[in-house]
A protein has these predicted regions:
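Conserved C-terminal "switch" segment of AAA+ ATPases
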Residues: 10-82, 108-112, 116, 137, ...
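C-terminal engagement/docking regions of AAA+ P-loop ATPases
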Residues: 74-156
Length: 156
């Protein structure tokens, strides 16, 4: 649990299509070594990281993040599906990751501040590796996706 919690988010990458996989085998098994292209220097990267931390977050977005993460904890949740099916829920790092994630997403999309839509867009990749289902929930076919969707109903 603790090791997984250190990852900012879990991004699932699908298999490449046929042409993409063809490019992979050609590019990675030949003697030609591609030249990397620098897109920004270290200073610009640090400045971008600092910029994200200065993006203002409205109280409604901050409260939605807190509500969502805290409702995912079986010990304190008032959602029956969470109490019954979740063995451990997201900790404070999930709250931090969502806050930074929504700020970064708003910057990337050219907006001055994050919205509830940013929270909803990032909640699955940020929470799914920070929660675990009980054995009985898994046996019954309950999924983390369905539990997280239930959490999203609270703020949507």
């Amino acid at each position: 649990e603790a090791q997984l919690d250190r990852f900012f988010m879990q991004v699932d990458v699908d298999y490449p299509d046929l042409e993409g996989e063809r490019q992979i085998i050609v590019n990675t098994t030949s003697t030609i070594v591609p030249e990397p292209v620098q897109v920004m220097d270290a200073k610009a990267l640090i400045e971008a990281q600092g910029l994200v931390r200065h993006v203002p977050v409205g109280e409604s977005v901050a409260e939605a993040i807190l509500e969502l993460v805290r409702a995912g904890r079986p010990e304190t949740s008032d959602i029956e599906d969470v109490k019954k099916n979740v063995s451990w829920g997201p900790g404070p790092r999930a709250t931090q990751a969502l806050m930074l994630g929504v700020r970064a997403r708003s910057v990337i999309e050219g907006r001055l501040a994050p919205s509830i839509d940013d929270v909803l867009a990032l909640v699955h990749p940020i929470l799914r590796h920070r929660m675990a289902l009980t054995f009985s929930a898994r046996a019954e076919g309950v999924t983390l996706r369905s539990i997280i969707d239930r959490l999203c109903d609270r703020i949507a």
